Amino acid sequence: AMVTKNNGDLDKSGTECRLYCKDNSPGQNNSCKMFYSNEDEHKGMVLPGTK
């Protein structure tokens, strides 16, 4: 079962869940997903609002 992750959720080790986007350009239909910051899947993705 997929667990729905929410911004600010903490995993067992206390790592915060954040929204990562593939493209940070304004107006893009960004493909955004929630990841814990210690997960590898968000490599190459960016946090919204960061350059």
Curated annotation (Swiss-Prot):
<dbReference type="GO" id="GO:0090729">
    <property type="term" value="F:toxin activity"/>
</dbReference>
<keyword id="KW-0325">Glycoprotein</keyword>
<keyword id="KW-0482">Metalloprotease</keyword>
<dbReference type="GO" id="GO:0046872">
    <property type="term" value="F:metal ion binding"/>
</dbReference>
<keyword id="KW-0862">Zinc</keyword>
<feature type="domain" description="Disintegrin">
    <location>
        <begin position="13"/>
        <end position="18"/>
    </location>
</feature>
<dbReference type="GO" id="GO:0006915">
    <property type="term" value="P:apoptotic process"/>
</dbReference>
<protein>
    <recommendedName>
        <fullName>Zinc metalloproteinase-disintegrin-like crovidisin</fullName>
        <ecNumber>3.4.24.-</ecNumber>
    </recommendedName>
</protein>
<keyword id="KW-1201">Platelet aggregation inhibiting toxin</keyword>
<feature type="domain" description="Peptidase M12B">
    <location>
        <begin position="1"/>
        <end position="12"/>
    </location>
</feature>
<dbReference type="GO" id="GO:0005576">
    <property type="term" value="C:extracellular region"/>
</dbReference>
<keyword id="KW-1199">Hemostasis impairing toxin</keyword>
<comment type="subunit">
    <text>Monomer.</text>
</comment>
<comment type="function">
    <text>Snake venom zinc metalloproteinase-disintegrin-like that blocks the interaction between platelets and collagen fibers through its binding to collagen fibers, resulting in the blockade of collagen-mediated platelet functions such as adhesion, release reaction, thromboxane formation, and aggregation. Binds selectively to collagen type I with high affinity. Also exerts proteolytic activity to matrix.</text>
</comment>
<dbReference type="GO" id="GO:0006508">
    <property type="term" value="P:proteolysis"/>
</dbReference>
<feature type="glycosylation site" description="N-linked (GlcNAc...) asparagine">
    <location>
        <position position="29"/>
    </location>
</feature>
<dbReference type="GO" id="GO:0008237">
    <property type="term" value="F:metallopeptidase activity"/>
</dbReference>
<keyword id="KW-0645">Protease</keyword>
<keyword id="KW-0378">Hydrolase</keyword>
<keyword id="KW-0800">Toxin</keyword>
<comment type="similarity">
    <text>Belongs to the venom metalloproteinase (M12B) family. P-III subfamily. P-IIIa sub-subfamily.</text>
</comment>
<keyword id="KW-0964">Secreted</keyword>
<keyword id="KW-0053">Apoptosis</keyword>
<keyword id="KW-0479">Metal-binding</keyword>
